[in-house]
């Protein structure tokens, strides 16, 4: 008889408009910090290209997302994917646009500035993007503590 206990993974979906920055950061941190207790994905309403500033600041944090692809939240919905948490990470995606996924335990909104909207020199934009990255990491750490 096999005495192994199978623990259900906590499934998390992060949603933003383009799936190019904030949702990608959050997904990467859940994958890194959540261990095998979590399964994370991210998607957007209008998938675009990964923001190069985000790729760079995540590389500084020793997380390589350069090969990540942006995905459509509507494709996930049509496929009938189930999530314990659906977390919107930009104000534009928190409203009516976000589909209601069946079986959601919690729907949460985290408001973070969009790195593509930052003004200033490249270094100033990089510093602002690092700040967003660090804020998202803290939010993910809190989520992991709460969910486990």
Where are these regions (language model features)?
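Cytosolic catalytic domains that perform sulfur/thiol-centered chemistry
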Residues: 5-11, 78-89, 129
């Amino acid at each position: 008889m096999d005495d192994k206990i199978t623990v259900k993974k906590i499934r998390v979906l992060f949603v933003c408009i383009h799936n190019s920055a904030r949702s990608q950061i959050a997904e990467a941190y859940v994958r890194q910090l959540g261990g095998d207790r979590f399964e994370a994905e991210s998607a957007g309403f209008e998938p675009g290209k990964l923001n190069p500033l985000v790729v760079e600041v995540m590389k500084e944090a020793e997380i390589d997302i350069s090969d990540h692809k942006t995905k459509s939240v509507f494709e996930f919905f049509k496929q009938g994917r189930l999530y314990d948490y659906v977390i919107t990470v930009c104000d534009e995606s928190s409203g009516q646009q976000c589909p209601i996924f069946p079986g959601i335990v919690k729907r949460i909104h985290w408001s973070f500035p969009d790195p593509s909207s930052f003004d200033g020199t490249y270094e100033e934009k990089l510093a602002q993007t690092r700040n967003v990255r660090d804020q998202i990491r803290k939010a993910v750490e809190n989520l992991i503590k709460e969910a486990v």
